[in-house]
Every structure is written in C-alpha cells, then in structure tokens.
Swiss-Prot record:
Protein's organism: Brucella abortus (strain 2308)
CDD domains tied to this protein: Riboflavin_synthase_like
Lineage: Bacteria, Pseudomonadati, Pseudomonadota, Alphaproteobacteria, Hyphomicrobiales
Domain comment in the entry: Each monomer can bind two substrate molecules, yet there is only one active site for the whole trimeric enzyme, which is located at the interface between two neighboring chains and formed by the N-terminal barrel from chain A and the C-terminal barrel from chain B.
Protein name: Riboflavin synthase
Function per UniProt: Catalyzes the dismutation of two molecules of 6,7-dimethyl-8-ribityllumazine, resulting in the formation of riboflavin and 5-amino-6-(D-ribitylamino)uracil.
GO molecular function, one term: riboflavin synthase activity
Catalytic activity: 2 6,7-dimethyl-8-(1-D-ribityl)lumazine + H(+) = 5-amino-6-(D-ribitylamino)uracil + riboflavin
Pathway(s) the chain acts in: Cofactor biosynthesis; riboflavin biosynthesis; riboflavin from 2-hydroxy-3-oxobutyl phosphate and 5-amino-6-(D-ribitylamino)uracil: step 2/2
Repeat positions for Lumazine-binding: 1-101, 102-198
InterPro entries the record matches: ATP_synth_asu-like_sf (IPR023366), Lumazine-bd (IPR001783), Lumazine-bd_dom (IPR026017), Riboflavin_synthase-like_b-brl (IPR017938)
C-alpha cells in the first residue's frame, strides 16, 4: 500500500518490449542498496514489482520493473518513452506517517486534463474521468492521480477539479502537466466500498 505522497521524480531510461508487456528501467534518487528485489514501487500510481537492480557497489541509481497487458491497457504506461518523468513512491512500512490516503496502486483508468488554471499561489486542474468512475468521485473526497493523493474540490457530471500548491507542483510531475494530458486515476477505496454497500441495501 501507499499514501499518495510522492517521494521522488524518476525518469524512464529505457523501455524494452516483452511478450504481452514491457520492461522499464527507471532512474531514481533512491539508493538501490535500500531496495530489495520483489519490492513494490508506485510508478505514477501504478504498483510495480522491482525485478532488477544495479550491481552492489555500483554508483548507478536505477531499478527495473515489468508491466503487463492489464497495466498497459488501463494506464498511461503504454505511452511511456525514454526521458519521461514519473512520480515515485515506495510502499508503506509499519510506523510510516500516513500523510495522504490509502492508495493501493491498482489504477482504475485514465483521466484527461481539461483545463489548467493559475489561481494565486496554486494551480487548479479540471479533469474528465471515465463515465464508469464518475459515481465514485465526490466533492471533498480523495482521489489518486498519477499516484498523488489529492482532494476533490468540485464535481460536475464526470468532470472534477483539484488544487495543487506550488510546492506540490515542484516535487511531482504535476508542474509539467497541461490540458490534453492523460493521468492515471485510482478512486478512493472507501468510495468503492460505500457504493457496493449501497447497491446491496437497495
């Protein structure tokens, strides 16, 4: 599990096609000595498993992960190319601060940025969610976008908006996001459970 608090901006170094998937090498500021094979790292919100690391004693800082058919179909990974910057977060450990909300790294689909608007020291992004996910997005609720835990400020049909302060723009890839871009979206699990419960109470 994750918290939606981004701890590094990684960069895609290489993309190697596999049978029904891809192998991604991600450059990172994380110390590879602190990463174990099999560890989970959220890459722009997608929970991926580390399958390779630099040799011990190497000054290189990267890790490799594999993404398969479902991830390529549901997420933005299918469009990733060498040089792309991505949000990174390592998995939650016992005792870690819970700064955002519980994020599982199981992306539900892609949302499209409709508008980016400066508002004083912050930036408001309006996004369009897939129709099937719209019922789970509520004002003042939580949503994970490219792995970032954000609060929904307003909702209008399948469009919603979020506000990011300048610091958040600087420590995530959101500073580069613009209208027309697509981002990974994971709806709040509590919203999913509430909807499921309501369905059975009808």
């Amino acid at each position: 599990m994750f918290t939606g608090i981004i701890t590094d901006i990684g960069k895609v170094d290489r993309v190697k096609p596999l049978n029904e998937g891809v192998l991604l090498r991600i450059e990172t500021a994380y110390d590879p000595e602190t990463i174990e094979l099999g560890a989970s790292i959220a890459c722009s919100g997608v929970c991926l498993t580390v399958v390779a690391l630099p040799e011990k004693g190497s000054n290189a800082r990267w890790f490799e992960v594999e993404a398969w058919e479902e991830a390529l179909r549901l997420t933005t990974i299918s469009s990733w190319q060498s040089g792309r910057k991505i949000n990174l977060e390592r998995s939650l450990k016992l005792g870690d601060e819970m700064g955002g909300h519980l994020v599982f790294g199981h992306v539900d689909g892609q949302a499209e940025i409709v508008e980016r608007k400066d508002e004083g020291d912050a930036v408001r992004f309006t996004l369009r969610a897939p129709e099937e996910l719209a019922p789970f997005i509520a004002q003042k609720g939580s949503v994970a976008l490219d792995g970032t835990s954000l609060t929904v400020n307003g909702v209008n049909a399948n469009e919603f908006d979020v506000l990011l302060i300048r610091h958040s723009l600087e420590v995530t890839t959101w500073g580069e996001r613009k209208a027309g871009d697509k981002v990974n979206i994971e709806i709040d699990q509590l919203a999913r459970y509430a909807a499921r419960l309501a369905q059975y109470q009808k």
